[in-house]
Regions:
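Membrane-anchoring hydrophobic segments
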Residues: 1-177, 212-215
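Membrane-water interface signatures at transmembrane helix termini and the short loops
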Residues: 39-51, 189-193, 197, 302-313
Length: 313
């Protein structure tokens, strides 16, 4: 019941901002939809591992939404209600030429990082069979951040062609090739998140550059991603019995395309509840800065930055 109520609330909050702005990717509308909708999904309690959240957890979730909602409203009014991003303003600050070099350069760097990881580690995840955690093992400290930076290229490609592209067919063809390489890398890494992020970011960029975009574009993108998501899950040597067993799903026959995303979403909220109950003190944001400590190498210089207890729920 609580899950259904939160789904309705998420839909209403998104529709409220969409009707007012006419913007499919209205920032507050999207945040409200995914934040509250994610809680609704977690409240379905499809797994035996899930428990009721503490009152403090509910208060934190509510304050996060209210704080974002009010802050956005205040800033939106101060800025004249012009939340919509338009490409006209962007075109005044940029040209096709620098975008071309950025796309090609980032593709080369990302591909080189991927090849380096594959050479040093001795395998490519998508080619490995029977090893469910091949993706987790395909990781070199610091370098992997460079490898996955390819997820920015599809969105940059959208910007490139939105500005007219190049008069040279070869240059345009090279950009398309770069976009294909950027999609291929997450597939070779069997990284579902990176693939989904790359596609969704490109779709959002396209929507931001157009005045009128059909909501069906999002539906088509999601439908197109589902088979890719399932295939990558299979390539990871994850079958539905394995996943439903690990996540202790109440219904052992739950389809894999429901189990996988559901647990990713639900676990975020359940993990937060676990930390609310177990953490003796607030980390003051230090845990959230782990990517900085890893990329900069500071975690090796000062291990205390990442020396936090691991809680299992």
């Amino acid at each position: 019941l609580s899950g259904a109520a939160l789904f309705l609330a998420a839909g209403y909050l998104y529709a409220y901002d969409y009707r007012r702005s006419g913007n499919l990717i209205h920032l507050r509308g999207l945040f409200s939809c995914f934040w509250v909708g994610g809680q609704g999904a977690a409240c379905l309690k499809l797994s035996k591992l899930q428990t009721d959240w503490a009152l403090q957890t509910w208060i934190c979730f509510f304050l996060a939404l209210v704080g974002f909602w009010i802050t956005f409203e205040v800033l939106d009014r101060l800025m004249g209600g012009n939340e919509r991003f338009t490409m006209n303003r962007y075109r005044q600050r940029s040209t096709v030429r620098p975008l071309f070099f950025c796309i090609v350069g980032l593709t080369v760097i990302s591909a080189a990082a991927f090849v380096t990881e594959a050479a040093v580690l001795g395998f490519i995840p998508v080619l490995v069979r029977g090893v469910p955690h091949a993706y987790s093992a395909f990781h070199m400290t610091g370098l992997h951040y460079v490898t996955v930076s390819c997820v920015l290229i599809p969105a940059m490609t959208v910007l490139y062609f939105e500005q007219g592209g190049s008069r040279s067919g070869r240059k345009n063809g090279l950009i398309v090739l770069c976009a294909l390489v950027s999609i291929a890398i997450p597939i070779l890494c069997v990284s579902r998140f990176q693939l989904v992020f790359a596609v969704i970011l490109a779709v959002f960029t396209f929507c931001a550059s157009q005045k009128n975009v059909s909501p069906w574009l999002f539906v088509v993108a999601v439908v197109a991603l589902i088979p890719c998501y399932v295939l990558l899950t299979v390539a990871r040597s994850h079958d539905v019995t394995y996943l439903n067993g690990i996540f202790e799903m109440k219904n052992a026959a739950t389809p894999i395309f429901i189990t996988q995303p559901y647990m990713y979403i639900a676990n975020n909220y359940d993990n937060f509840d676990c930390l609310v109950r177990e953490l003796p003190a607030h980390s003051m944001g230090l845990k959230g800065m782990f990517p900085l400590w890893a990329l900069s190498g500071l975690k090796f210089i000062k291990p205390a930055l990442v020396d936090w207890p691991i809680y299992v729920n």
